[in-house]
Amino acid sequence: MNREKVICACHHVTAGEIEDAVKDGAASFKEVKKLTKAGKSCGKCKKKVKKFMEAILEEQNIENPECVCAEPGRDAERETQPMKYDFTTIMDRRGKDAIAVDEIPFENVEVKEGFDRIPMWVADMNFQTVPTVAEAIIERTKHRAYGYFMPREEYYDAIINWQKTRNHVEGLTKECIGYENGVLGGVVSALNVFCSRGDKVLLHSPTYVGFTHALENNGYDIVHSPLKRDEDGIWRIDFEDMEQKLKEQHIHAAVFCSPHNPCGRVWERWELERVMELYRKYDVMVVSDEIWSDIILDGYTHIPTQSVSEDAKQRTVALYAPSKTFNLAGLIGSYHIIYNPQIRDRVMKESSLSHYNMMNVLSMHALIGAYKPEGQEWVGELCKVLSGNVDYAWNYIREHFKGVSVSRPQGTYMLLLDCTQWCEEHKKTIDEVQRAGVEVGVIWQDGRPFHSPCGIRMNLALPRVLVEEAFDRLNKYVFAEC
């Protein structure tokens, strides 16, 4: 064996390193990936590594081939691990002010008699959140005065500890943290500092519809750099297209989404480094939406954009929130992390100009409750449940919905279905497909506002029994072969 032969080109992992990992006890692809980073998020390298591992295991008479070839996030593994928190109870949210269950995002279409609604559209989870959130809110409401207040030190300490524990962020201080009513408000405030109205701003498409509305409503000209799917179906940044647009259109501000919504990509370090190097080269200021950074599926790791270089740290406004992680959108409350003091002062001033950007006392206590150790534990279990749901849906689509294409998300709990081929083969429009799903109670979301022309966006953050029921209905009533 040539131990110097490079098996994984992306991370320059050699045959010798993989062999050593196996000798150290790694008996599955997942274990080798942890030890060497080999094949991480790279389809071509993953296949090479698996094939090379099979040869080593066979040579050493180690029986475990199914571990080598299995896809990440196996349900059988998860089912052997008991859950402390409840992700199986079906909550009745009707009449509780939840648009996810009380609204249908399509006009002139109703659910047929005999079908109940399965909410799979807006990014809102149908799980009970961690108990410490409710406990923190209830404890504060017992003190029956809710007047003007100052954020307590515990609020900042909770954020600092959360970022250190989950994202390995060292050296974060209270001064770098600022409140934002919402991530989109923070995006606009940062752009108002970086740009003048009418300036061009780079986004990668498919694009979160909230970005589109926020930027257009505030007078910015959006320039899209489309992501491309590689031969393994993984969404990739088109660096050539990105650089060309930055250079030719003189763009000096960008909104970056990490993990990406709606595609679900969890960017690798080399991708972030290359993106930020282009932004440095063309003097582009960056707003990084990292609201999904806690929802990372099995086998992947979130890397904060600001962490990849000192320059990235100084030119980036990063936005986070507990709202997506713990289903707290109705309470309002996000925060920014800005290390550059000049930018930080200007963003905070911009955010305060309309007097809208004021923290809610219950929102503050909700974050403190969410970011407790119990919250860390709850998110860990949540991500296992979501990984299982994603695996189930992805495999079901590939097996049953011929002509429907989908990339397996690495983060978030949203699927983006591409129905182009299916619609062409069955002479159907995407409107007809969407209507057929809603009529049988699968309340999903039109992908076109996300720049997915024949796409459908689906939320998988609900108990598995509902996910299975939804896909059974789609198979029987929507994508059934004639």
Where on the chain are the PLM-derived regions?
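Helix C-cap/helix->beta junction micro-motif
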Residues: 218, 281-282, 312, 440, ...
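N-terminal small-domain helix-loop-helix segment of the aminotransferase-like
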Residues: 84-182, 189, 373, 481-482
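Conserved glycine-rich beta-strand-loop-beta hairpin in the small C-terminal domain of fold type I
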Residues: 368, 384-394, 406-420, 454
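Immediate flanking context of iron-sulfur cluster ligation sites
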Residues: 2-5, 23-40, 59-65
